[in-house]
Amino acid sequence: MKKVFLLYILFIELIFGGCQNEDNSANTIGEHKNVPDYTPSSEDVVDMHGEIKNKERFEVFLNNVEKGNNDSIRVVRYTEEGDPMLHDLEYDGEVIKSTTDTRRDKFGAGSISNATCTSAEIVETTERTEYVLEGCDNTIDNIILVTWK
């Protein structure tokens, strides 16, 4: 009887052991190979869950765009889990080149998207102020930054 019971346990272990997947995709969601580490810069505008750091630098960028002066800036938004999502904006005196890099978001799809936009606008509501890109050649999330009132 003991031998039958041990054979039964061994059989069950083989069945469950054979069903295991070594890849375990739950642990690889959002992992992207060959993504360089993000190194923060004192020039970055940082949105940490609604708390904006270095907003003055962002306002200088908007002012330069309005005046037609070349400028570039990086806006970094952090996810709830603390992953940085980078949004690089480069103004060449005519258009704003937007590059959004979400590859470091462990729970997102992770991609790099590019767009060329004609302007940056300020949209005021009673609850918040949105800074958005306008006249973009690609369908993108055109919100650069949001400040809450």
Residue ranges of model-derived segments:
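Positively charged n-region of N-terminal signal peptides that target proteins for export
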Residues: M1-V4
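C-terminal partner/receptor-binding element of secreted or periplasmic proteins
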Residues: T116-K149
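Bacterial signal peptide processing site
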Residues: Q20-E22
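Mature extracytoplasmic domains of secretory-pathway proteins
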Residues: P40-I122
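C-terminal motif of bacterial Sec signal peptides marking the signal peptidase cleavage site
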Residues: I15-G18
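Immediate post-signal-peptide N-terminus of mature secreted/exported proteins
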Residues: I29-Y38
